[in-house]
């Protein structure tokens, strides 16, 4: 009932929140299969990875489940600047009683391991190899972390949980959409006990989510506009699969389009500044045709034509 889906599972929860518990979004709509995977992770200490296209709400999904369980949640973005030192910790010079001394400052991983925290590694397939091997140590359920510099072994808290999100499934990117991602060691992928896929939603679900996120459009006329926006997004997704265009509208893009349409009072202009202007100029006539098919009006000529000098 808490998640609006029909499943019979007992999941532990905390009676009180803390500063690390995400805020509840009352408009959030849960995907049944993804929610089931995340709840299994919380209830049975499974290592859960959620894979899917950008903007589908993978990280938010984990956060919103954690929010309703009052479970502290910490997200770490595995960009190329996150290093082994950031995760494990380092020696730092500190002042104590007027003297400079060297003291070990633990990183985010030892800190989280010792606490009832759900740790989420975002952009998991973009992590550096040295960072990935640190994570591999704690992927087992009893995953103890050995700090060699400190001669210390950290045992995970009984309510520590580990999640990850990725655009690819560890086999690299063949679409060209996700530069910076890389193949993941299959011995490491084997340690993720549940891998869920969260891709684009049905037209009805996506329309309901956008109407909930942008209440100004939650009436008969507004819903017609939202349905046209979702239809346009689906055309870009079909066009991408067919190889006609190289950029797709994610659910996040559609929400941004609706928000900008509310700000400007003009869907045509909102579409141009939200999506069209970041697309390849050669592909803009195709996108203009998609727009015309969904909204029944032409985009301004100057927004489409490519200037040849």
Predicted feature locations:
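Alpha-helical lid/collar subdomain of P-loop NTPases
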Residues: 1-18, 35, 202-207, 211-309
